[in-house]
Structures are given as structure tokens and as C-alpha cells.
């Protein structure tokens, strides 16, 4: 296994639990990436959220499939969850530390802390799970092996502040549409404050980044820097991470009174999500940024309630590398030109934490099967895991871009269902039923992680 991120951690666990010895190579702490802060396994470098928890949402369905397949990474996320409304968010420090300990104590797993600068010998079954922050040397060897230039986009992480430094006389606790408990801190803005904040974002100085050209940079649309959203239009942020709809401060009056709602609702709202179990740290939701650190502090302290905010981490931008998977990989995640080499995680062109875990589960499962002389598997297209792996292996080459889990990847239902919630529920029911059949046919998953 090359890489101990989400995918590599999951893959290593699946191979070890299959009774096979696995060598896990990780370059941290010998060499750090631009976005990592520790040498722990499965470090979450951007958000601490795996996305919606409900299984009638695409991310939630993917998580549920992985639970049923015995994913250790998702099981540990459940164990280290923090309040986040309808999302699965984790205490990222405890989460990564627990997975690191789990692998370090496994008798079948041996760690090698060094940079892998080239692909291993061709007679070894290998899983490439180096993620979007693959080192330059290995990326160059991959280019030689595939005969293709890698693809890339620019991604960023959000700042984190101390919860005690938020002025709660201006902010309030609530979840959107009152889902779950009041899990988010919300900082409301009026129109004047919002426009002033946007102007400051547009004028702020950005950090210098290798290969980054603002005019020609490629971003992942689902994770745009906040300053890029500001550039796209006056109201873009208000219809994105700063949307006020569904958020109400009880101090504003009766939420059920339409006239009160119309008169009092904020023009925009900045949300903060809990980072740790103790609620001491909070990240600014949707505030990925490439501003210089001094500029981040100056501009973000314009947000009502954050005037005295203490920042424990500023946002950073980094280059994300991924393979042109449709030209290289099968749905089993094997390279077509070298079947005992598999790829997993975001380097394959899937987007999101749960999708990376799914790739790790499948690559690890198939690596073990290859060693035992068994036929590799793929999952039904009607499951979210199967839909993602089939998409990245079959999408048109040339304009391939990372894909997050979504219901549009699944085959259409036999009957049209107009109601969206009912339709998504039907997708879920079919996916979980087909997953059960696949598990029974191939004796897959359901491996519990230890206490």
C-alpha cells in the first residue's frame, strides 16, 4: 500500500483482515505535503465532514453501503462523530489517531515511513493510494508509466477558530431547518455588512502558489475558494455557503410568524461547524481560501461575531493531482496495462472522503483476492460504490473531471417517481438490496472493527 490516507488506510485494513501481510508506505513525517499537519493515518486535510448522514442522500447512501461492507474508516467515523446537524462530522484529531493506532497494532500491518519515489516491482500486488497530494517524484514516475500527463485542480481548506472567542451576543446556535440539535454557530449579516465583506474579499491579497494562475486555474466546483465565489457575482455567496434560508435566531421572534420572518431574516449567514468532541474548535463552513494569512484574519474578523476570533489554523490552497482514470483503470480499480497494480481514493478521480474510502475498500478487497488467486470483483452499478467505480472507468476521456457521489450516476428506476424524496428513497432501497445480494454471493464485508 502506497499512502496512508483514507483510501490507503481502508485498503490496508481489508487486506490485513483477509489474513495477508501488508506493507504500508507513508512519506509523512519524513516529507510533508502542502496541506497535511500530522503524520497520522487518514488525516482529514479539508473539512471534518463526510457529508449528509441520511441514506436518502447520495453521500449518506455511500456511507451506509460502506458500513454494511465492514469499512473500518466509516465505523471509526461513527465512533468519533461530533454534532453536525444532518451530517457525519468527526473530531479529526482523535479520529486519525485511533485509526493510526489500529493499524500500528495490527499484527499483519508493517509501516514504512519513507517517500516512495517510483512504482514497485511488477511482480508485487500494489495499491496506489497516494491521494491528490502525490509527491512530485512519484507523480513523474506515474507519468512515465501511463504515458499521460496527470490531471489536476486546485483545492483549499477552511480556517478554524476557538469557540470561546466567538461573540455569542451577535451569533446564535441553530441547525438549518432545525434538523437535529442546534449544532452550528451562525453569524448573521445584514446587506451592508455582506457587501462590505465581499468587497474586502475581492481586494484581499492572495498567497503565492506554485503553478497557480488565477486567470487559468481549474477548481473543483463543489469546493470553490470563498474569494472565487465572491468574484463570480454579488449574490453567489448568498446562494452558496452564506445562504440564510432555514436559519433562525429565537431572539428574532416567533419563527412561525411569516411577517416576523420576512422582516427579521438575515441577509446572509456564515456558519461554523464543530471540529472536536469538546466543542473548543470550530471551522468556517465553505470558507476554503488562498488568501494570505494576515489577510484572512483581517477580512474574516469583519464577520459579525468573529471580530475577536482566535484562529488556530488558517486556510491553505494546494494542487490536487488525479489520473485520467477512464483511459487507465477498470471498474475493479486495476490498471489495464498492469492488473496487479490498483489505484484507490481521490487520485482515481472520485471526490469526497466517503468516495475515497469506497475506493480503498474495493482496491483492498481486490488486492487480497489477487494474492489468493481469486477473480477481482466490482459491485453492481445500482449501488453507489459500484456506480462511482464504473463511472471513473467508463467516462469519456479527454475532459474527465472528479466526480462526487450523486444519484445521477445510478441507473434509472423502472418506474418514474416524481417526488424527489420518494425517488431518492427508492434508489436507496434498491442499492441496499442489491448490495446485500452481492455480499451474499461473494461473501463480502461485515468485518467489525475492534473496540
UniProtKB/Swiss-Prot annotation:
Pfam family, one: GIDA
Major localization class: cytoplasm
Location relative to the cell: Cytoplasm
Main enzyme class: transferase
Molecular-function annotations in GO: flavin adenine dinucleotide binding; tRNA (uracil(54)-C5)-methyltransferase activity, 5,10-methylenetetrahydrofolate-dependent
Record carries keyword Flavoprotein: yes
GO cellular-component term (any): cytosol
Keywords: Cytoplasm, FAD, Flavoprotein, Methyltransferase, NAD, NADP, Transferase, tRNA processing
Reactions this protein catalyses: uridine(54) in tRNA + (6R)-5,10-methylene-5,6,7,8-tetrahydrofolate + NADH + H(+) = 5-methyluridine(54) in tRNA + (6S)-5,6,7,8-tetrahydrofolate + NAD(+); uridine(54) in tRNA + (6R)-5,10-methylene-5,6,7,8-tetrahydrofolate + NADPH + H(+) = 5-methyluridine(54) in tRNA + (6S)-5,6,7,8-tetrahydrofolate + NADP(+)
CC cofactor: FAD
Positions in coiled-coil regions: none
An example Gene Ontology biological process: tRNA wobble uridine modification
Role summary: Catalyzes the folate-dependent formation of 5-methyl-uridine at position 54 (M-5-U54) in all tRNAs.
Family assignment from sequence similarity: Belongs to the MnmG family. TrmFO subfamily.
NCBIfam families: gid_trmFO, PRK05335.1
Protein name according to UniProt: Methylenetetrahydrofolate--tRNA-(uracil-5-)-methyltransferase TrmFO
Source organism of this protein record: Synechococcus sp. (strain WH7803)
Gene that produces this protein: trmFO
Amino acid at each position: 500500500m502506497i499512502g496512508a490516507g483514507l483510501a490507503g488506510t481502508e485498503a490496508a485494513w481489508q487486506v490485513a483482515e483477509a489474513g495477508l501481510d501488508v506493507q504500508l508506505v507513508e512519506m509523512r513525517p519524513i516529507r510533508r505535503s502542502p496541506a497535511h499537519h500530522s503524520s497520522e493515518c487518514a488525516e482529514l486535510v479539508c473539512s471534518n465532514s463526510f457529508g449528509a448522514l441520511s441514506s436518502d442522500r447520495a453521500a449518506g447512501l455511500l456511507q451506509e453501503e460502506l458500513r454494511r461492507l465492514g469499512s473500518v474508516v466509516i465505523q471509526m467515523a461513527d465512533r468519533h462523530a461530533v454534532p453536525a446537524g444532518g451530517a457525519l462530522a468527526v473530531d479529526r484529531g482523535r479520529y486519525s489517531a485511533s485509526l493510526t493506532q489500529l493499524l500500528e497494532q495490527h499484527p499483519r500491518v508493517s509501516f514504512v515511513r519513507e517517500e516512495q519515489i517510483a512504482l514497485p516491482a511488477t511482480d508485487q500486488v500494489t495499491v496506489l493510494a497516494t491521494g491528490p497530494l502525490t509527491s512530485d517524484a512519484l507523480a513523474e514516475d506515474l507519468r512515465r508509466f501511463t504515458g499521460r500527463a496527470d490531471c489536476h485542480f486546485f483545492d483549499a481548506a477552511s480556517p478554524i477558530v476557538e469557540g470561546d472567542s466567538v461573540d455569542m451576543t451577535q451569533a446564535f446556535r441553530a441547525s438549518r431547518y432545525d434538523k437535529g440539535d442546534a449544532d452550528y454557530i451562525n453569524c448573521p449579516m445584514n446587506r451592508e455588512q455582506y457587501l462590505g465583506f465581499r468587497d474586502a474579499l475581492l481586494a484581499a491579497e492572495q498567497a503565492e502558489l506554485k503553478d497557480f494562475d488565477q486567470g487559468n486555474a481549474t477548481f473543483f466546483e463543489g469546493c470553490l475558494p470563498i474569494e472565487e465565489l465572491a468574484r463570480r457575482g454579488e449574490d453567489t455567496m448568498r446562494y452558496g455557503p452564506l445562504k440564510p434560508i432555514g436559519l433562525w435566531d429565537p431572539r428574532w421572534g416567533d419563527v412561525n410568524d411569516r411577517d416576523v420572518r420576512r422582516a427579521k431574516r438575515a441577509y446572509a449567514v456564515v456558519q461554523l461547524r464543530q471540529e472536536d468532541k469538546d466543542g473548543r474548535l470550530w471551522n468556517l463552513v465553505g470558507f476554503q481560501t488562498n488568501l494570505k494569512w494576515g489577510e484572512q484574519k483581517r477580512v474574516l474578523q469583519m464577520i459579525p461575531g468573529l471580530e475577536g476570533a482566535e484562529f488556530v489554523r488558517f486556510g491553505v490552497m494546494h494542487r490536487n493531482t488525479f489520473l485520467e482514470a477512464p483511459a487507465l483503470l477498470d471498474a475493479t480499480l486495476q490498471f489495464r496495462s498492469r492488473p496487479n497494480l490498483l489505484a484507490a481514493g481521490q487520485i482515481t478521480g472520485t471526490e469526497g472522503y466517503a468516495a475515497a474510502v469506497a475506493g480503498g475498500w474495493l482496491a483492498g478487497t481486490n488486492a487480497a483476492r489477487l494474492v489468493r488467486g481469486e477473480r477481482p470483483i466490482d459491485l453492481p452499478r445500482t449501488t453507489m460504490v459500484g456506480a462511482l467505480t464504473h463511472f471513473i472507468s467508463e467516462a469519456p476521456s479527454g475532459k474527465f473531471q472528479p466526480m462526487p457521489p450523486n444519484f445521477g450516476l445510478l441507473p434509472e428506476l423502472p418506474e418514474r417517481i416524481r417526488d424527489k424524496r420518494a425517488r431518492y428513497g427508492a434508489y436507496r432501497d434498491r442499492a441496499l438490496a442489491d448490495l446485500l445480494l452481492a455480499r451474499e454471493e461473494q461473501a463480502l464485508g461485515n468485518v467489525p472493527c475492534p473496540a
